[in-house]
Amino acid sequence: MKKVDVKESAVGRETRIRKQWNEQSIFEQSIQNREGAQSFVFYEGPPTANGLPHVGHALGRTIKDVVARYKTMAGYKVLRKAGWDTHGLPVELGVEKQLGISGKHEIEEYGIEPFTKKCKESVFTYEKQWREFTESIGYWVDMDDPYVTLENPYIESVWHILGTIHEKGLLYKGHRVSPYCPSCQTSLSSHEVAQGYKTVKDLSATVKFKVKDSENEYFLGWTTTPWTLPANVALAVHPNMEYVKAKQEGHVYIVAKERVQDVLKENYEVLSVHKGEELLNTSYTAPFPMKEVTNGYRVIGADFVTADSGTGLVHIAPAYGEDDYRVVQSEGLSFLHVVDEKGEYTEVVPFLKGKFVKDCDVDIVRYLAKEGLLYHKEKYEHSYPHCWRCDSPLLYYAGESWLIRTTAIKDTFLQNNDTVTWYPDHMKHGRFGKFLENMVDWNISRNRYWGTPLNVWECESCDHQFAPKSIADLRKHSTKETPEDLELHKPYVDEVQVSCEKCGSAMNRTPEVIDVWFDSGSMPFAQYHYPFENKELFEEQFPADVIAEGIDQTRGWFYSLLAVSALYTGKVPYKRVLSLGHVLDEEGQKMSKSKGNALDPVDLVGKFGADALRWALLVDSAPWNAKRFSERTVLEAKSKFVDTLVNVYSFYVLYANLDEYNPNETYDVKRTKLDEWVLSRLHSTTKKVRTALDDYQFTNAAREIAALVDEVSNWYVRRSRNRFWESGMNAEKAAAYETLHDVLVTISKLIAPFTPFVAEDIHLNLTGSSVHLEDYPVVNESLLQPKLEAEMDAVLQVVELGRSNRNQHSLKVKQPLAELVLLEHNENDMDWESYRDIVMDELNVKAFHVELDETKYTSYQLKLNFKKAGPKFGKNVNAVNGWLKQLSQDEVQNFVSTERAVYEAASGEEVVVTTEDVLVEKVAKSGFSNTTNGQYTVMLDTNVTEELLQEGVAREFIRAVQEYRKQLNLPVNLRVDVILDTEEELQQTLTNHKELLEENLLVKQFTFGHLTNEDDELSLGETKVRIKLSAAQ
């Protein structure tokens, strides 16, 4: 075995292992070795390569890698195809910035062809950084053969899906109100909108709509979007709701009966009550009368009107509200647009022409006030949608869009979701399920340039549509020869003209591109260019056994995958979804570069190593929980887990090499109870870890492994050190080597999916083979000893209590104590005699015994809990307190046992006192200190005799010299001669404990003499000792 370089950094180790993986094609071998095995399928959600990775990506890549590595080691064939999301607005916005242009007008002036070429060039800006990040974090995924959404084969598969949907009559062109981004100048789908809500404060207004031909009667309407008022064409009431006419300060106002108090507040008189249906068709004067409204400005009925807020009357602007649009269509009222595609008022509103509407709420309200039409204004906090790409506030905007009739197969969506296992499970019928319940038709078209072109050609003369499902299909119907290398992007596909099968006229492609979420949702099919090729491979890789991405993908990729698959095949595309929580900063705030609280995962790997970062992300909390995260989190993972394991491994290699131990040779071995215990712990942990990983409970699995590594380091190795330090090779020492070797090899396999680099380093050095080509450990039932584990757990509890006891009373473990008494509070069959020596050695005590009668070593003190007893006992409270103080210890003991006692007050009244009224404190016998955990109480004799004090000094001296040896980098097996120069009293103490010193310090000759200032000095408290070490002669 190679010597472990303890000075090698984690990054150095990981760089070395990566090189070895690449040179020996270990990733490729891990897949090839499972050829013919059952497939386990996972899909890689495609990131965009025009932005850099963040800590959330580190979590996602870690989880996916853990799953893929574990399933591979568990015997499955796991293909891991990378992917790139390369279309959409982020790319366009980046290119606009690069070119110094802004908006669709300037893009078209620049030229669509050069613009889309620039987009294509820019999509892989950070591909090198993504590849380096992916490899450095240890995520094994095939980046040499990824699916890329901009490539023709991928787009052709998307066209086949869209063409099939069109064939089914589910793709249609409609005029409707959709969420619209005025900055990007395109509409968005409902699932895109769901990703961008923000809590904002907007100016709201309660507006007076004067009843026509009345002097002082007004409908009151409330709106949080005053900018829409110039487009008003109607007021809506609920036909079955009650409304009142109420007089206030000379005016009569009409509002919902349920809302009158909240709206008018005070000083009003209700004149009459009317059903909403009685108000229908009442005409009013609009705040902004428009000549274009030839049929409108009257009250209509609508079921969506409620009395939950506002006035119970809804101002209707059909161009800017979905409900508004529908009700106006059904009523046959006028339609009025007052806003252009940039979100600015048109000449229809002259005094605000050219202004962005969301900036005009104050202007609108001022105008209303000036005209006497403003009843009330206030800031209103509400959730408002923003563009998930550019962060601009959205408008609801009427226009033509291409939509997929997802509502027609809503039941399929819901049924498919019912078959999926969600982590966390509440997502299934909660956030995701509710979104499906309330879904609307998918707005699939985008009035942009860089994206998959919508493959629909429309006839110039009739209503016929043609939706080619392949390039060959398009060529077959085109009126002129199409290039062999036709690129399926704008403007190239726009130049292809088709002849109408119905009337023979020319057909042109509709100019839109599609929603990028449809691109990524098509990946199960398009990644293999299905159905044009790879049919068998696709069928083997569909559906996914698991997908894992951030929770923000609930209404993104998780939805688009489900939707595309349901629309195309009717089938569900995945069996399990791991919805990962946000990685937050230390204060629980979302990380962002603008706030300056974002952590760069590349920097974290560079400082602490990928294993530490991965472990920190896994062990802290379940991956679907939001987690607070910082550099300190990663540092703790490194020091507590990775470094601890490396220390155990280096300890083993150091001593095994010194003793020339060869695990491949056969030795006579005699296992101790400690060996049997650690092997049982190893296999019981293996059992728990496999169960947890099979249920995707990564954190539970990681914590089980962490506990095992801690016990191996801080219990097994520490308790076995003397065996490793012995000279020669005997049966017990050989058993220690054999046991620790088996433990380390198995742990390296257990952690391989979690921390792949350190796992590889250990396994490769101990066995000569890659851990990632091994099978995952299975439980050896014959090595499980539950009773032994329970007994050792009890020992560990007692030792921990003893250490805590010493800490509380400032008694160093190096200071021997006379006695430890263990009080057991629950009867059990624990054989403490078998563990006597371990407990005494660990806690450095001279005697140990178990006592069932705790009254010999403890007593109870009772104090009245005045907070509870005061109200209960009233005037008797002080008398009860005095009575408690004078109880004998037997009476106190009886009270604690029975949990009640009766005090007879001076008045003769019997007062029942229970343990709920009293604070019960257990007090140790004089000269003892106690610590308890409910099951056990550890009593330590704190009287330190002179003899014990001197031994404590000797043990402290041993610790100091051992540290000194480390500083000198002396070989651990080097026997030394020691010369000491110190005061006479310490000389005598050390002489009295010469054997103890020689045994623990590998000292051959131990002498006292005069040393010069050039020699080194050790500190033992306030005492100084000069020391000189040399190799023993």
From Swiss-Prot:
PANTHER family: ISOLEUCINE--TRNA LIGASE, CYTOPLASMIC, SOLEUCYL-TRNA SYNTHETASE. It is found in: Cytoplasm. InterPro entries: aa-tRNA-synth_I_CS, aa-tRNA-synth_Ia, Anticodon_Ile_ABEc, Ile-tRNA-ligase, Ile-tRNA-ligase_type2, M/V/L/I-tRNA-synth_anticd-bd, Rossmann-like_a/b/a_fold, tRNAsynth_Ia_anticodon-bd. It holds the Pfam family DUF5915. Its EC number is 6.1.1.5. It catalyses: tRNA(Ile) + L-isoleucine + ATP = L-isoleucyl-tRNA(Ile) + AMP + diphosphate. CDD domains: Anticodon_Ia_Ile_ABEc (cd07961), IleRS_core (cd00818). Monomer. It comes from Bacillus thuringiensis subsp. konkukian (strain 97-27). Its cofactor is Zn(2+). Its main location: cytoplasm. This is Isoleucine--tRNA ligase 2. One of its GO terms (molecular function) is zinc ion binding. It comes from the Bacteria. Belongs to the class-I aminoacyl-tRNA synthetase family. IleS type 2 subfamily. The gene is ileS2.
